Amino acid sequence: MRWKKLLFWGSALLSVGADQLTKFWVTQNFELRRPPAQPDTWPLIQNVFHFTYVTNDGAAFSLFKDSPLLPWLSFLVCLGLIGLGLFGPRFPQWEQAGYGFLLGGAAGNGIDRIFLGEVIDFLDFRLIQFPVFNIADISINVGLACLIFATWQSSRKGSRKTPTP
């Protein structure tokens, strides 16, 4: 296999690896406390940024909570992105990175959903009262940002080729 999609596979492996390693670290160093108990937390900057061990059995921001289809949806998204990586065309660099980060993020949270029944979250920005999240969530957002940038970049290139009246 030629490495014509190295950025795709590299960003996918980097993001799923970082996600699973950080979640392993959290499970080894924090105690999972179920509500109504307060979660185990470690303030890096008091009332600004904490590591807080919580779980989420829904998707982003607890959407689709308790849905039995969510693990299968994660699996199908990963399967589609793997298929794109194996059989799809060679995309420009920003698209490769974008799809790779999406795959890594979907796989990271999908692994949790399939094997644990819930996703481990631990990044807690208290200053802005943002929901607790994880590296996989960051990877998904980075992937979307890369794809938006790729679309913007290609539309700029396309508009340069169009003659003006």
Swiss-Prot record:
EC number: 3.4.23.36
GO molecular function: aspartic-type endopeptidase activity
Topology in the lipid bilayer: Multi-pass membrane protein
Pathway named in the protein's UniProt entry: Protein modification; lipoprotein biosynthesis (signal peptide cleavage)
Pfam families: Peptidase_A8
Superkingdom classification of source: Bacteria
One Gene Ontology cellular component: plasma membrane
Disulfide pattern: none
Signal peptide from the UniProt entry: none
Catalytic activity: Release of signal peptides from bacterial membrane prolipoproteins. Hydrolyzes -Xaa-Yaa-Zaa-|-(S,diacylglyceryl)Cys-, in which Xaa is hydrophobic (preferably Leu), and Yaa (Ala or Ser) and Zaa (Gly or Ala) have small, neutral side chains
GO biological process: proteolysis
Keywords carried by this UniProt record: Aspartyl protease, Cell inner membrane, Cell membrane, Hydrolase, Membrane, Protease, Transmembrane, Transmembrane helix
InterPro entries, per the entry: Peptidase_A8
Residue ranges of the TM segments: 68-88, 100-120, 130-150
Catalytic class of the enzyme: hydrolase
Active-site residue list: 121, 137
Protein's cellular compartments: Cell inner membrane
Entry similarity comment: Belongs to the peptidase A8 family.
NCBIfam families hit by this protein: lspA (TIGR00077)
Biological role: This protein specifically catalyzes the removal of signal peptides from prolipoproteins.
Protein name (database record): Lipoprotein signal peptidase
Organism: Acaryochloris marina (strain MBIC 11017)
Gene it is expressed from: lspA
